Amino acid sequence: YDSVTVGIDLTARDKQAEARANGNPWDIAKGFDNSAPIGKFIPLPEQTPKADNINFSLFINGVKVQQGNSQDMIFHIAYISQFYTLKIGDLIFTGTPAGVGPVKIGDHLEGYLEETKVLDFFVK
C-alpha cells in the first residue's frame, strides 16, 4: 500500500440504547447507511513509509476534539497482516482516541492526517 486516509466509525446511540434495552445485538447502530465516512487517500509521508507514525485529528465545528497517532494502535498493520490478506483499498480503523462525543445535524466534521485535510463534511 502507498496511501492512507482517515475514517469515522459513527454510532447511532439512540439505536444502540434501544437494542441494548431490548437485549438485542446493537450492530444496527454501527452499520447504518453512511455510518463510516472516509476521506480522500493521500500518499504515505516519506518519513513514515509503513504508516506506523502518522498523526491524525478530528475537528467538529472548528474545534479539535480528537487526536491520535498510528503508532498507538494496539495491533499494528504488520501484525494484522499475519491473519488477514490485506490488499489496496482495504480499510483498517485504528481505534478511537480520547474525545468521543455526540454529533448532530448541521455539525461540520473535518479529518486531518498531519496537516492535510482529507475529510470534510456536514452531518445530515
Where are these regions (language model features)?
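Catalytic-pocket segment enriched in acidic/His residues
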Residues: 5, 13-124
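Active-site glycine-centered loops adjacent to acidic/histidine catalytic or metal-binding residues
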Residues: 9
